[in-house]
């Protein structure tokens, strides 16, 4: 039952936002009483924390599996983007913004964990890309890594890119293209063009 609650809460939070979904909504969706939910989660904050932890672990594991594969660094970045988009269900509402606004402590912990994971993954990706000649060798690794992470969070910022004006999926595509085309060599650009031509 606890896993059912967690998975349904994740679905509702991603579709409608962390603030918008109430414990009553969750209980109704599951066909159970709120008392049953409180047997596993002391309050909504505890549930939000559990959902964000679950999402983070799921996405981190998926990204690790992609990085352990045989893709070249550019293909790897496109695969990670698609996996993350799918795992977040295209962020149909603005869960990132609501989490930041209404659960700032949980958000701060999540951002720290995300940065550590993305920093390691991105730096390894760039190093391999340089070795293969598809990324420029004059890249400032620390700067580019942090800029990529900053951009990843910026495109999810509701005030900068409001959902009623910008398509989140398109924003992720634009952000990745901005990142890769800025660091790619002519050889790397050929790979990017081939991948984007298929999509």
Stretches found by the model and what they are:
Residues 66, 95-99, 159-162:
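Secondary-structure edge/capping motif, primarily at the C-terminal ends of alpha-helices
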Residues 124-128, 132, 165-199:
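C-terminal peripheral helix-coil segments that are non-catalytic and often amphipathic
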Residues 89-124, 131-135, 143:
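Short secondary-structure transition hinges
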